[in-house]
A protein has these predicted regions:
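Non-catalytic cap/lid and distal C-terminal segments of serine-dependent acyl enzymes
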Residues: 73-531
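Contiguous beta-strand segments within globular domains
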Residues: 45-55, 61-68, 209
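Bacterial N-terminal signal peptides
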Residues: 20-35
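Boundary at the C-terminal end of the N-terminal hydrophobic targeting segment
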Residues: 33, 40-44
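Short beta-strands and strand-coil junctions in structured, solvent-facing domains, enriched
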Residues: 58-60, 219-220
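Aromatic (phenylalanine/tyrosine) cluster motif
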Residues: 4, 12, 23-27
Length: 531
């Protein structure tokens, strides 16, 4: 989910998943090549706009079984590929199709039969001048369109008129560079660990990544050990987010290095995986990410960076990270000493945003026939519907389906759904009609945190006492406060009490948290010092 506002933004750093462009890519120069257009007058046949995409002469190993995009933009200020996935007024026109294999010198045609968004067919595209670019997304280990090693074309300026036969040729001559680990500093370290558990699940090497911020004076006393603060960002936030936290002047850096600040090793998890953000719980589709985290990554970090174990670990997160921090605390109640969660994703699937997943028939349409909202502004005005958002994800996902989009609805489905016979997540609802699959909805119950607490209360309550600290804005742009009220009501009524702290912020939006970094660290210190 998006992180809009926060009283401690460096602590709970999120990312707009509605606009999937990595921030640093916005400043890349747009390369515009000469336009290659073939136009023919076809009086005896329907007009057809098409794009012929040529693979590179040397096709990279593994550059098969991917998603091919053609993106059309009115603006030359940014490469069209970097706008892919946007919703609202800034969304580009795009076409997409799956490609199983490329042959050198043999183009793949993208045209009227392929998935189109936001226009549902090419005839709806307004005629005029566009900047056009092709992108081939094939990276199997990082599910986002502009992932490292994916192929793309130079930008071409083209006049487009759906009423004429126009064939535009684009060549995939460019490649996004491989991902590099940022430079380490005195306080900043990075881990890239091959996971035996995940590699076995996927049948190929899969790596766990994390950014680490060391406490002040870490090098001065080699015998001192520190508790771990495990942080999870908003949807798809990468582990490299720590570079802006400690690498540049900021309120976080000032607090972190101040005298009297409780000393922790901060571990920022990576929000990227083969199906997008893995949510760090065990899943039929993502694999055993929860087990890999608790049995491989955290023990490795504690062993190599003088962590205190066992049990001296706390969690925090915003949005997606808010849900993950709560889920890890609930699913591993003895392993962690507390979770500080801001605006978590839905914690009760009776309020999956505004969908009651267990009772309603359709995700797109309410019982009264009104389109169901997905996003609002702080004044309550609806800015996006679920139908429109899922269509945007259908563009990104394989088989024209959101389940592998690497975005919000796709990643919830990848995490919470069973695995289909084709190896893909089973859709929670039909990607075109929105009709909810009742059997799949029943499977999702195992990740419904409120329901899980209810079903396992007797065993969980003694180990969760005083460990849940949650903040939720009452004007949350994605209606996540609705589910939080259901959890709050449950925890207030349930006995014995676990003394959970849930704070609601009137008028506060998505990303709000009630504590400063300094106050949060003080509460975390008290938690790890408990016997």
């Amino acid at each position: 989910m998006t992180s809009f506002s926060s009283s401690s933004s460096m602590l709970f750093s999120g990312r707009s998943w509605r606009l999937i462009v990595p921030f640093y890519l916005l400043f890349h120069a747009v390369i515009i090549s000469s336009t290659i257009i073939v136009t023919t007058e076809a009086a005896d046949s329907p007009a057809r706009l098409s794009f012929e995409i040529f693979p590179p002469d040397q096709i990279p190993p593994g550059a098969t079984n991917g998603r091919l995009f053609v993106i059309l933009s009115r603006s030359s200020s940014i490469q069209p590929r970097l706008t892919l996935g946007r919703t609202g007024m800034q969304r580009p026109q795009a076409l997409a199709r799956d490609v199983a294999a490329f042959s050198p010198g043999q183009p793949v045609t993208v045209g009227a039969k392929d998935f189109s968004f936001p226009a549902t067919n090419l005839s709806q595209i307004p005629p005029g001048e566009y900047f056009v670019q092709a992108l081939f997304d094939y990276n199997p280990d990082l599910r986002f369109a502009n992932a490292p090693e994916n192929l793309y074309s130079k930008v071409q300026k083209a006049g487009i008129d759906p009423a004429k036969d126009i064939a535009i040729k684009l060549a995939l001559t460019e490649q996004i560079p491989p991902e590099k680990t940022p430079k380490e500093t005195q306080f900043l370290k990075f881990v890239k660990l091959e996971s035996k558990l995940l590699s076995k699940f996927y049948g190929r090497p899969i790596f766990l990544r994390a950014g680490i911020v060391l406490p002040k004076d870490f090098d001065k006393n080699q015998s001192q050990h520190y508790p771990l603060w495990v942080q999870i960002g908003g949807l798809n936030t990468r582990y490299t987010a720590v570079t802006t936290m400690i690498g540049t002047p900021s309120s976080f850096r000032e607090t972190w290095l101040a005298e009297g600040t409780p000393r922790f090793i901060l571990v920022h998890l990576d929000g990227a995986g083969p199906l997008g953000d893995p949510y760090y719980v065990d899943s039929q589709n993502n694999g055993p990410f929860g087990e890999a985290l608790t049995k491989e990554l955290i023990p490795y970090i504690e062993a190599h960076y003088r962590g205190v174990s066992p049990g001296k670990r706390v969690l925090s997160g915003v949005s997606t990270g808010g849900w993950v921090s709560l889920a890890l605390q609930v699913f591993y109640p003895d392993y962690f000493s507390g979770a500080w969660s801001s605006c978590p994703d839905p914690v009760d699937f009776r309020a999956l945003q505004l969908i009651n997943l267990y009772d309603e028939e359709n995700a797109f349409v309410e019982a009264n026939g009104r389109e169901r909202p997905s996003e609002r502004d702080l004044r309550g005005k609806v800015t996006l519907t679920i139908r429109e958002e899922v269509r945007a994800e259908n563009l990104l996902g394989r088989n024209n389906c959101y389940t592998t989009s690497g975005e919000q609805w796709g990643e919830w489905t990848a995490t919470f759904s069973p695995r289909g016979r084709d190896g893909s997540p089973i859709p929670i609802w039909d990607p075109t009609t929105g009709r909810i699959d009742r059997e799949v909805a029943n499977y999702w119950k195992r990740y419904d945190l409120r329901l899980y607490l209810e079903q396992h209360w007797a065993e969980l309550a003694p180990n969760l006492r005083g460990k849940l600290h949650i903040a939720s804005g009452e004007a949350d742009q994605f209606y996540l406060n609705e589910a939080m009220h259901l959890l709050d009501h449950f925890l207030q009524e349930k006995k014995p009490s676990i003394e959970a702290k849930i704070v609601f912020g009137p008028g506060k939006g998505h990303g709000w948290f009630d504590l400063s970094v300094a106050d949060t660290l003080k509460e975390m210190q008290a938690a790890v010092e408990k016997p």
